[in-house]
């Protein structure tokens, strides 16, 4: 780091800045580029017109990017805070960083005291999450030692320390992710707790949480901003699980005139929720809302939404619930919000927001409140008579979901909700290249917002660049794949590129551990067999297509060879196996691999069905874990 930037900066201040930098650097590539700045201002929810934000970002890039490489390095970031501190632009930048949820309280850097530097975190979020978790786990005997937590104290940060609550919440969001048999519930020594936290973090990663900056020690120490950040991701995945057309065909009722099902399927869960709320508001004769922050502060839209979705008692066995609208005319915003929440309580949906959260327009908690309303009372009817091609509504395949979760766990931006539609401008693919150490020249990349006219041309240019990078520096096999295919969302060809990205990522991890020695399938298979035989195990594998892998016994034995004694063989079935036996073995194997510290993205079914690509990633991750034993 250059001298000038560090002269008057203490170690604590530097740590604060590093943390702030990491929050803005969404793809964790060590640089901030302009689309990450756009995201920051979007999330900070600042009352600035779009043109003003664009001006600020241009100015920041102009002043901050001193070596003119189109991105801001950490040194340049420090320089902005040190040298440009007094300017209005830098003040706005600092305010945006402070407003982004879960970010440390950045003062004016040099004014920060080196002692007692405090990370700020959102009390509102803590309160909301504690109440949600208390309700979700109230009957779980394994959580009696910590549930119910007091939302007004720091109970939450202590409660997550042994990993059990986190594992349980992951399973509530994506059922069956973690095999309960792999969670340590008794005799919680520090080593056993470490294993639970490994299991929670690697499983969170496997369902698509971005956990790159979080370690088991952070959770054991209950670092508030990291705990809240992880919990929000886990809770949100659960809340959004059914806000997806293939899992909820009634959402087709939200189609607008002239809109195709394909277009509706491209919307993110957030966009679908907004569309859903507006569908009901329109039916009630109330004006539309554009967000779940400023537009809901007066609770009036919420009153109408509750009134529309409350059961009318017309279906058999459905009790009628009447919403009392008298609070609508209350003059005080807080009292009106309280009155609205009392009505939500009648529906069993008083969750996530307090009256103050509604009135302040907290975007995260209001989004959660609305998602929960949708999940309990969608109040939509699947359209019958329309000319709709329902065959489009096939859900994503397991492989597609695994790829998507892998990308999201690396913190790509924007978040990938739909594998093909969200890769059509190649921005995510270009970020993945950076993750596999293929340099990207961001000055060649077109970034959103794209112009109304010619938007697709801009996206296609990105796709062409992505294919070019794949052929040359990355040396992928991309025969017959062009930028147009990515831009069209061609499934087979997009998958071919994405698989090569994931494979390279997996092999890179091994090469880093093996001092740069090239890794390939044969090397992994040989290592697996050598490790098994040295540990006195009788299993072995011929290749990643070996049908014996479907019993998962080779995987289980390998885990036990890497960490002797960790497998409870009473839980493992051998001999003549039924499909159920195989599935139970695979489920245990995947969870145990994650528990000993392997970041496995594959699913138990991949082992049972011996899917060679995913099988390769399982053994490669275990080899990586095995090589760390030095």
Curated annotation (Swiss-Prot):
What residues does the Calponin-homology (CH) domain cover?
A: 123-239, 267-378, 397-506, 518-627
Membrane spanning segments where? none
Which residues does the annotated region (Actin-binding 1) include?
109-382
- PTM-bearing positions, type Phosphoserine: 268, 293, 326, 339
Outcome recorded upon mutating residue 235 to V? In DIH5; uncertain significance
- State the residue spans of region: Actin-binding 2: 383-627
The molecular function GO annotations come to: actin filament binding; calcium ion binding; structural constituent of presynaptic actin cytoskeleton
- Please report any disulfide bonds recorded for this protein chain, giving both cysteine positions: none
Ranges for domain EF-hand come to 12-47, 52-87
Query: Where is it located?
Result: Cytoplasm
GO CC terms: actin filament; actin filament bundle; cytoplasm; cytosol; neuromuscular junction; plasma membrane
Determine if RNA-binding is one of this entry's keywords. no
Tissue and organ distribution: Expressed in a variety of organs, including muscle, brain, uterus and esophagus.
Q: How does it assemble?
A: Monomer.
State what this protein does.
Actin-bundling protein.
Which disorder is recorded?
Osteoporosis: A systemic skeletal disorder characterized by decreased bone mass and deterioration of bone microarchitecture without alteration in the composition of bone. The result is fragile bones and an increased risk of fractures, even after minimal trauma. Osteoporosis is a chronic condition of multifactorial etiology and is usually clinically silent until a fracture occurs. Variants in PLS3 have been suggested to be associated with a variety of abnormalities of the skeletal system, ranging from non-syndromic childhood-onset osteoporosis to osteogenesis imperfecta.
Name it.
Answer: Plastin-3
What is the originating organism of this protein? Homo sapiens
What taxonomic classification does the UniProt entry list for its organism? Answer: Eukaryota, Metazoa, Chordata, Craniata, Vertebrata
Quote the gene name from the UniProt entry: PLS3
């Amino acid at each position: 780091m250059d001298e000038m930037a560090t002269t008057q900066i203490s170690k604590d201040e530097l740590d604060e800045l590093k943390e702030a930098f990491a929050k803005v650097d969404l793809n964790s590539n060590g640089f901030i580029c302009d689309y990450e700045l756009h995201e920051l201002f979007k999330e900070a929810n600042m009352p600035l017109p779009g043109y003003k934000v664009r001006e600020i970002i241009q100015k920041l890039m102009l002043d901050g990017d001193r070596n003119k490489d189109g991105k801001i390095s950490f040194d340049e970031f420090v320089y902005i805070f040190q040298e440009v501190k007094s300017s209005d632009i830098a003040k706005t930048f600092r305010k945006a960083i402070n407003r982004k949820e879960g970010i440390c309280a950045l003062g004016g850097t040099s004014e920060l005291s080196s002692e007692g530097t405090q990370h700020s975190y959102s009390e509102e979020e803590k309160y909301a999450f504690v109440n949600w978790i208390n309700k979700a786990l109230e009957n779980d005997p394994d959580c009696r030692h910590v549930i119910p937590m007091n939302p007004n104290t720091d109970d939450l940060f202590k409660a997550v320390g042994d990993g059990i609550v986190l594992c349980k919440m992951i399973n509530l969001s994506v059922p069956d992710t973690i095999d309960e048999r792999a969670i340590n519930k008794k005799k919680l020594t520090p080593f056993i707790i470490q294993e639970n936290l490994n299991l929670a973090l690697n499983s969170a990663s496997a369902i698509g949480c971005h956990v790159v900056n979080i370690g088991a020690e952070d959770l054991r120490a209950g670092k508030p901003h990291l705990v809240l950040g992880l919990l929000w991701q886990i809770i949100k995945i659960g809340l959004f699980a059914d806000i997806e057309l293939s899992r909820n065909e009634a959402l087709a009722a939200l189609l607008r005139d002239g809109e195709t099902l394909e277009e509706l399927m491209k919307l993110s869960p957030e966009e679908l929720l907004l569309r859903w709320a507006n569908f009901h508001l329109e039916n009630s004769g109330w004006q539309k809302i554009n967000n779940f922050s400023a537009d809901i502060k007066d609770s009036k839209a919420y009153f109408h939404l509750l009134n529309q979705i409350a059961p009318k008692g017309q279906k058999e066995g459905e009790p009628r619930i009447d919403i009392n609208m008298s609070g609508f005319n209350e003059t005080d915003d807080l009292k009106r919000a309280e009155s609205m929440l009392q009505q939500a309580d009648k529906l069993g949906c008083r969750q996530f927001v307090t009256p103050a959260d509604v009135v302040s327009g907290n975007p995260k908690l209001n989004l959660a409140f609305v998602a929960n309303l949708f999940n309990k009372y969608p109040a939509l009817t699947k359209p019958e008579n329309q000319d709709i091609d329902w065959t489009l509504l096939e859900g994503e395949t397991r492989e597609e979901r695994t790829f998507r979760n892998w990308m999201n766990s690396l913190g790509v931006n924007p978040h990938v909700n739909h594998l093909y539609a969200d890769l059509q401008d190649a921005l995510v693919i270009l970020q993945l290249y950076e993750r596999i150490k293929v340099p990207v020249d961001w000055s060649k990349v077109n970034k959103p917002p794209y112009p109304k006219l010619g938007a697709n041309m801009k996206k296609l240019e990105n796709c062409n660049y992505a294919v070019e990078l794949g052929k040359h520096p990355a040396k992928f096999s991309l025969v017959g794949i062009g930028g147009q295919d990515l831009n069209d969302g061609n499934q087979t060809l997009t998958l071919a590129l994405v698989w090569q990205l994931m494979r390279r990522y997996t092999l890179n991890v091994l090469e880093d551990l093996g001092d740069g020695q090239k890794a390939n399938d044969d090397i992994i298979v040989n290592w697996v067999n050598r490790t098994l035989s040295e540990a006195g195990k009788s299993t072995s594998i011929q290749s990643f297509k070996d049908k014996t892998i479907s019993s998962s016994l080779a995987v289980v034995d390998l885990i036990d060879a890497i960490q002797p004694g960790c497998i409870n063989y009473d839980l493992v079935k051998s001999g003549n196996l039924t499909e159920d036996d195989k599935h139970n073995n695979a489920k245990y194997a995947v969870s145990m691999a994650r528990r000993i510290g392997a970041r496995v993205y594959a699913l138990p079914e991949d082992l049972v069905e011996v899917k060679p690509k995913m099988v390769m990633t399982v053994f490669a991750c275990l080899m990586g874990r095995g090589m760390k034993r030095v």
